[in-house]
Amino acid sequence: TCEKLEYVYVGAEFNRKILKYGGIMIHSSAVEVDGKAYLFSAPCGTGKSTHTKQWQKYFGADQAIIINDDKPVLRRLEDGWYAYGTPFSGKTDENVNKKVKLQGICMLERGENRIRQIQPAEAIPLILQQTIRPKNEKYLGKMMEIMDQLLREVPVYRMQCDISEEAVKMSYEAMKG
């Protein structure tokens, strides 16, 4: 439909423009707890939204706020990295217009509950798969520059999990610092 085409076009243009401001959009679900943003990223259908919904169930919807359920922006300011809500929030249309200090990024997979922090070399291909990569070399170079700094400064985790309260507790305990 025309609406879907417009959404895709505007999203791609937004993604290019945000690079000029040191931001990147990552296909993920971002949830805020205690003033910190936790990002869960994975391919479509893995369970990002399901996992952050479990956070709301565990902490309460007033304590676990979905910042953006599909494409938040990550951007570095003087005092660190922040997750921003965007209007590009996928089929759930859950987003808020705010920025929240980024606590960590978690690459999600289905499996038995376990989590570990990973190094940038392991994180880069996983996160790159969840970005909109510009075709223009200048924009792609800028995106890679931002991604490099992000991965050097923000902890990234790899988690296998099921749909359980235990998975929420495990991810929160590992990522909260």
Model-flagged regions — what are they?
Residues 1-15, 173-177:
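Charged, amphipathic alpha-helical linker segments immediately N-terminal to NTP-binding catalytic cores
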Residues 28-29, 33-43, 57-177:
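Glycine-rich, often acidic-flanked micro-motifs
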Residues 17-33:
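Pre-Walker A adenine-sensing motif
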Residues 11-20, 57:
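Short, intrinsically disordered, mixed-charge
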